[in-house]
Amino acid sequence: ADDDKSAMWKYANKHKIEERLKENNLDNIAIQGEFCGPGIQKNRLKLTEPEWYVFTVTDMNTNKRLSLYKTEEICKLLGLNMVPIEEVEEEFKYKNVDELLERAKGKYASGKNKEGIVIRPIEAVYSNTIAGPLSMKVLNNDYLLKE
C-alpha cells in the first residue's frame, strides 16, 4: 500500500512514475525491475540512495513482454534506468556451459562480484516448456562464494 513507509513507494512517488505513465498514455503496461540500495541485499552496488533498474516491460492488454528496444524506448520516455545491457547479438554465440560461466564473471563498479547475467532474445519468444517468455540466468560462481 502507498503509505509512504515502503522504500519502493517512496521511490515511485519521488520519481513520479505513476504520473509519467498517465502523461504518456502507458496505463496498460507493467514494469518489472530490481530495487537496489542501502539496506537491500547487502547493497552490493554500494548505492547511497535507492535505485530501480528495469528489466521487463509487459503489455497488459496482450500479456506479452516487449522487445529490448521497446523497453529501452519506454524507459527513456519515463526517465527510468534499465539494468545494464552488456551485450546484444543477433545470434547466440556461446557453445557450451563453460563459456557461459566465464561470461557471467565480473565485478560491479563497487568492486563486489556481480551476480551473473540474464540472457534473453531481443524480441520475446514464448516457450511452451516454461509456459512463458524465454529467459535464462547464468550465475557468476565467484558471487556464490563468501566475500
Walk through the language-model features, giving the residues of each.
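Core nucleotide-handling region used for phosphoryl-transfer chemistry
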Residues: 1-147
